[in-house]
From Swiss-Prot:
Name used for this protein in its record: Cyclin-dependent kinase-like 3
Keywords linked to the UniProt accession: ATP-binding, Cytoplasm, Kinase, Nucleotide-binding, Nucleus, Phosphoprotein, Serine/threonine-protein kinase, Transferase
Taxon lineage: Eukaryota, Metazoa, Chordata, Craniata, Vertebrata
Enzyme class, first EC level, given as a word: transferase
Biased composition regions of type Basic and acidic residues, renumbered to the chain: 368-403
Species, as recorded: Rattus norvegicus (Rat)
Record GO terms (molecular function): ATP binding; cyclin-dependent protein serine/threonine kinase activity; protein serine kinase activity; protein serine/threonine kinase activity
Annotated Protein kinase domain residues: 4-286
PANTHER family (alphabetical): CELL DIVISION PROTEIN KINASE (PTHR24056), CYCLIN-DEPENDENT KINASE-LIKE 3 (PTHR24056:SF177)
Domain remark in the UniProt entry: The [NKR]KIAxRE motif seems to be a cyclin-binding region.
Binding site for ATP: 10-18, 33
Catalytic machinery residues: 125
Gene name of this polypeptide: Cdkl3
SUPFAM superfamilies documented for this protein: Protein kinase-like (PK-like) (SSF56112)
One record GO biological process: negative regulation of axon extension
Tissue expression: Highly expressed in brain, and to a lower extent in heart and testis.
């Protein structure tokens, strides 16, 4: 969170909070969903599920996930910020949305639901709070914490999902063999609320909800009634038997004719009789008076406008199902608005990585001139690989402009004349392709990449570094041979002169060692390296001689001192006696030498 500035709290739920934040570098406003730190595994399971689905499925009417990171054992999901929902619209329009706005919203919501269902995904929590509305009027389905893949025959689901007011009767009765129709039921309840401004089945308990379903929608099917009678929760409860009109427009008199037909097709007690999302997009409510042909160009223009502002790239493939988020702040998904141009960013990372690999190669290399051709060869190979990498990168689906054919017929993908091969599970809606590993930033960040990209300046620098290191090695070997020569003390004067000569040699060696160019001085910072190396390699008397040399070099600060120390002590006393005979007669002759 260091890169974000918190602006306030957007919402709070049982699993976490949503904060409005601003990226400090780019100034972009984002929404960060922070999951609570709880001991139970349900929170991590929900977070993992949401990350998995948002990573795998991309659509213009699904909310975009920017990045994921963990901080202080809390999972953070960073989304594009849209601070407006259908619930906010309903609070503003107390009597429901106007018919034109309602139809545009429902068309986009159905496209998102159809995309999920065609990919065998059940959202399981469709409600006005989970429908985001951008400033340009594009709706985005969000909150995939309860979404899951359609179960195989015989498998069961979790029974407690979805908000109660929009929960299908099979969910209320905890029938674990439910499927896609639960989303259609929730959509029908939400359509009535969006059209009238009031929730259709508000309830305080499961029993209260069942009672209202029987009163307003219809009686339970034999299968559901059997589950109800065997449930210990509803033991002793008897539901009323109500006769409902079969005509949808009489059953829902507050809705216009075609919209009442849609709601009646959605709110069927038997899940098998509920209409599918694809059939809903074919309904006369959307196909009459050329609505799709008129709305598609408008939607296309809005998507292009938002694509310029929110040009998302494909996420990195570094998320694992067993390990939801790594304990680091590396984003799972990156946004070029937050981290710069993805192509340039990838090239910079790749160049730095290759430079480090080249440095390791130079350090391990032995010899001088023989290695230079290999480096040049590696350089040429790196350039060819970089060109190949640049040719292999592909733009993301939002970076390119969507063609008219993609938006002309979102219901029938086979009718599109575009040559691009579409996902067979796309269901005909304008979709973004599943995430793959063709993005340039993925290639740049791939740790298994072994490409080397040395440039000419780096090659010259390695040559200089090799020459300097060889010079230092020769200097050290010469000084070691000179310093470790045999020394024999014949007289005090001769021994000191020999030590003085060795000091001069060491000083000259240090001078030669430090006599580099300014560029080389930046590369090497070890003025005491000769003594360290000698101390490790020399043994016995050689180490002692070095210590004696250091001690004597500290004592001899000026060239005048050796002449004083080389004088004989008896001669010194005689000269003092000749100059001060009286002082020496008083017993001060034995002064310390």
């Amino acid at each position: 969170m260091e890169m974000y500035e918190t602006l306030g709290k957007v919402g709070e739920g049982s699993y976490g909070t949503v904060m409005k934040c601003k990226h400090k570098d780019t100034g972009r406003i984002v929404a960060i969903k922070i999951f609570y730190e709880k001991p139970e595994k349900s929170v991590n399971k929900i977070a993992t599920r949401e990350i998995k689905f948002l990573k795998q499925f991309r659509h213009e009417n699904l909310v975009n996930l920017i990045e994921v990171f963990r901080q202080k054992k809390k999972i953070h999901l960073v989304f594009e910020f849209i601070d407006h929902t259908v619930l906010d619209e309903l609070q503003h329009y107390c009597h429901g949305l106007e018919s034109k706005r309602l139809r545009k919203y429902l068309f986009q919501i159905l496209r998102a639901i159809e995309y999920l269902h065609n990919n065998n995904i059940i959202h399981r929590d469709i409600k006005p709070e989970n429908i985001l509305v951008s400033q340009s009027g594009i709706t985005k389905l969000c909150d995939f914490g309860f979404a899951r893949t359609l179960a195989a025959p015989g498998d069961v689901y979790t029974d407690y999902v979805a908000t109660r007011w929009y929960r299908a009767p099979e969910l209320v009765l905890k029938d674990t063999t439910y499927g896609k129709p639960v989303d259609i039921w929730a959509l029908g309840c939400m359509i009535i609320e969006m059209a009238t401004g009031n929730p259709y089945l508000p309830s305080s308990s499961d029993l209260d909800l069942l009672h209202k379903i029987v009163l307003k929608v219809g009686n339970l099917t034999p299968h559901l009634h059997n589950i109800f009678s065997k449930s210990p929760i509803f033991a002793g409860v008897v539901l009323p038997q109500v006769q409902h009109p079969k005509n949808a427009r009489k059953k829902y008199p507050k809705l216009n004719g075609l919209l009442a037909d849609i709601v009646h097709a959605c709110l069927q007690i038997d899940p098998a009789e509920r209409i599918s999302s694809t059939d809903l997009l074919h309904h006369d409510y959307f196909t009459r008076d050329g609505f799709i042909e008129k709305f598609i160009p408008e939607l296309r223009a809005k998507l292009l406008q938002e694509a310029k502002v929110n040009s998302f790239i494909k996420p990195k493939e570094n998320f694992k199902e067993n390990e939801p988020v790594r304990d680091e702040k590396k984003p799972v998904f990156t946004n070029p608005l937050l981290y710069g141009n993805p192509t340039l960013y990838g090239k910079e990372v790749d160049r730095d990585k290759r430079a480090k690999e080249l440095k390791v190669r130079v350090i391990k290399a032995k010899g001088g001139k023989g290695d230079v051709p290999d480096l040049k060869k590696t350089e040429s190979e790196g350039e060819h690989r970089q060109q190949g990498t640049a040719e292999d990168t592909h733009p993301t689906s939002l970076d390119r402009k969507p063609s008219v054919s993609e938006l002309t017929n979102p219901v029938h993908p086979s009718a599109n004349s575009d040559t691009v091969k579409e996902d067979p599970h796309s269901g005909g809606c304008m979709i973004m392709p599943p995430i793959n590993l063709t993005s340039s930033n993925l290639l740049a960040a791939n740790p298994s990449s072994n490409l080397s990209h040395p440039n000419s300046r780096l090659t010259e620098r390695t040559k200089k570094r090799r020459t300097s290191s060889q010079t230092i090695g020769q200097t050290l070997s010469n000084s070691r041979q000179e310093d470790t020569g045999p020394t024999q003390v014949q007289t005090e004067k001769g021994a000191f002169n020999e030590r003085t000569g060795q000091n001069d040699q060491i000083a000259s060696g240090n001078k030669r060692k430090l006599n580099f160019s300014k560029c080389d001085r930046k590369e090497f910072h070890f003025p005491e390296l000769p003594f360290t190396i000698q101390a490790k390699e020399m043994k016995g008397m050689e180490v002692k001689q070095i210590k004696v040399l250091k001690r004597e070099s500290k004592k001899t600060d000026s060239p005048k001192i050796p002449t004083l120390l080389s004088m004989d002590s008896n001669q010194e006393k005689q000269e003092v006696f000749n100059i001060f005979p009286g002082w020496c007669k008083r017993g001060n002759l034995n002064w310390p030498s």
